[in-house]
């Protein structure tokens, strides 16, 4: 596992965006051989999406031959609702870059057959071979996507019940009213995530410090979903300074020394 220790959320966004752009450009995608990118929603990736849009407008990257799969979507929330993940992604990213509509894949939380929707999502991912890079965030309790604590580390795309803590955390997007936050969501599984060629998790804020500690210094444990990254051959954690407050000094020093060349210029 790589840990990229930075100072601010803006630096995390810029580093992550630069990494994505470098991966896409090195891949040299074509219509017949697209780069497949997994994407999250929420507050954490906002600085990354902003940086990606800026890099696209500066001519540094094209998304014309990029295929995206989003991590999750609320169940029962209309697609046009401002807080649906469909709306979030278009508002913050898709509408500002040159990605074709047919290359965008989002789970349908209003599908008449939820099980079939989840199964078809997995099949479509497999039809591309694999996701080349899956970017995500992490919850205070260590969840990735909506894989809440005690999720199977072999799980696939499915419907999940959201914990009260997750709904409270997400209520900031719903007028701070937890009753407006859906109780269920569709989410890729931990196994789906681990199948990706590379996984990059962004970690921001002191409230994520215990989750980061569990991921880096703890044991693999289904109560801390984030710890599954220890099983992945190519995992990256990109974090700001407040999120590292629970790490041992020697752990942080170790990764600072390892990544010194990769965090220059931010």
Curated annotation (Swiss-Prot):
GO biological-process terms attached to the record: carbohydrate metabolic process; glucosamine catabolic process; N-acetylglucosamine catabolic process; N-acetylneuraminate catabolic process; UDP-N-acetylglucosamine biosynthetic process
A GO MF term: identical protein binding
Keyword tags: Allosteric enzyme, Carbohydrate metabolism, Disulfide bond, Hydrolase
Annotated positions for site Part of the allosteric site: 151, 158, 160-161, 254
Matches recorded under Pfam families: Glucosamine_iso
Activity regulation annotation text: Allosterically activated by N-acetylglucosamine 6-phosphate (GlcNAc6P). Competitively inhibited by 2-amino-2-deoxy-D-glucitol-6-phosphate (GlcN-ol-6P).
Record note on what altering residue 118 to S does: 50% of wild-type activity, but 2-fold decrease in substrate affinity
Key word Hydrolase present: yes
Active site: 72 (proton acceptor), 141 (for ring-opening step), 143 (proton acceptor), 148 (for ring-opening step)
EC main group: hydrolase
Gene3D superfamilies in the record: 3.40.50.1360
Domain of life of the organism encoding this protein: Bacteria
Annotated Gene Ontology cellular component terms: cytoplasm; cytosol
Pathway this chain belongs to: Amino-sugar metabolism; N-acetylneuraminate degradation; D-fructose 6-phosphate from N-acetylneuraminate: step 5/5
Catalysis: reaction(s): alpha-D-glucosamine 6-phosphate + H2O = beta-D-fructose 6-phosphate + NH4(+)
Subunit-structure text: Homohexamer; trimer of disulfide-linked dimers.
Miscellaneous comment: Disulfide bonds seem not to be essential for the stability of the oligomer under physiological conditions.
Name recorded for this polypeptide: Glucosamine-6-phosphate deaminase
Species of the source: Escherichia coli (strain K12)
Encoding gene (name): nagB
């Amino acid at each position: 596992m790589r840990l990229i220790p930075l100072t601010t959320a803006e630096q995390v966004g810029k580093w992550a965006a630069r990494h994505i752009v470098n991966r896409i450009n090195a891949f040299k995608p074509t219509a017949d051989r697209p780069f497949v990118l997994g994407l999250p929603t929420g507050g954490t990736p906002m600085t990354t999406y902003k940086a990606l849009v800026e890099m696209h407008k500066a001519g540094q990257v094209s998304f014309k031959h990029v295929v995206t799969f989003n991590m999750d979507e609320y169940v029962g929330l209309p697609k046009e609702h401002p807080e649906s993940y469909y709306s979030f992604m278009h508002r913050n990213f898709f509408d500002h870059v040159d990605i074709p509509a047919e290359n965008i894949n989002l789970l349908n939380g209003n599908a008449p057959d939820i099980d079939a929707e989840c199964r078809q999502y997995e099949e479509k991912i497999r039809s591309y071979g694999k996701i080349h890079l899956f970017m995500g965030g992490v919850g205070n309790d260590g969840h990735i996507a909506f894989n809440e604590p005690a999720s199977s580390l072999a799980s696939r795309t499915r419907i999940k019940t959201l914990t009260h803590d997750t709904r409270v955390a997400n209520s900031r997007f719903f007028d701070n009213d937890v009753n407006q936050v859906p109780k269920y969501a569709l989410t890729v599984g931990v196994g789906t995530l681990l199948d990706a060629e590379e996984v990059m998790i962004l970690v921001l804020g002191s409230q994520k410090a215990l989750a980061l500690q569990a991921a880096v210094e703890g044991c693999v444990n289904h109560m801390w979903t984030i710890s599954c990254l220890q099983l992945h051959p190519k995992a990256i954690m990109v974090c700001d300074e407040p999120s590292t407050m629970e790490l041992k000094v020697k752990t942080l020093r170790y990764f600072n020394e390892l990544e010194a060349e990769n965090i220059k210029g931010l």
